[in-house]
């Protein structure tokens, strides 16, 4: 055990003192300097919104499809990149960026359209990698072949929104696919040597500390290259915000009697 602890301490030194390899550390090691993400909008939708699986999206998802800080969708991909770089470069002298397609489901479109926008992003001289946020059930063979093709040009990362391994919670948040679909997607991506980053949410309603740890233990055994640990973020106007304010009925809907109150900023200041 002492040897193991010593090994862990030595590893922390190589990770700048942290007990894990952070994204910032990995990017510096890989690209030789600080790298930022520029968040892009490919103008896509989601099967959980267009009626294929549902119309209201995941319970926590905003109207912006979790891409509220993405660039203006009316701009071309190149223009989006330039506008994002202009915003970021005013703060720090960053030279290298990752093109991150975040809003909605970014493989939920015809393959030729995906090829066009992804290649446009990757052709920018200051873009060093492509990161694509998507769903495991939107990775068909043609899409996988395209991603494999692009991965030979510059690194391609796929960010999958798993959130939890527990089916009961997945149904509550309206994730819209079974856990086995996630497993298959990871396997398919790794066969093509495409790196996978998994998004999880800590603090989902009804989940215990042990259930959260079960999700982490499961992912520790998977062939994935990164994990994003997100604290539950309740956005105004989402179904999650509504359901946390109101008591759930037996059929899973929300009662009209509020069980909590939101304190507005002005009210909070009056309490100080």
Predicted regions span which residues?
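N-terminal [4Fe-4S]-dependent radical SAM core
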Residues: 1-57, 62-98
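Core AdoMet radical
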Residues: 64-84, 88-111, 126-139, 155-181, ...
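Acidic (Asp/Glu)-rich catalytic clusters
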Residues: 89, 118-125, 147-155, 187-191
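Distinct, well-ordered alpha-helical segments
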Residues: 111-119, 140-149, 210-212
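Short beta-strand/loop segments at the ligand-binding rim of alpha/beta enzyme cores
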Residues: 192-200
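Catalytic cores of alpha/beta
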Residues: 205-220
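Conserved small/polar residues in nucleotide/adenosyl-binding loops
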Residues: 246-251
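Short linear proline/tyrosine/threonine-rich motifs used for host-factor recruitment
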Residues: 260-262, 268-270
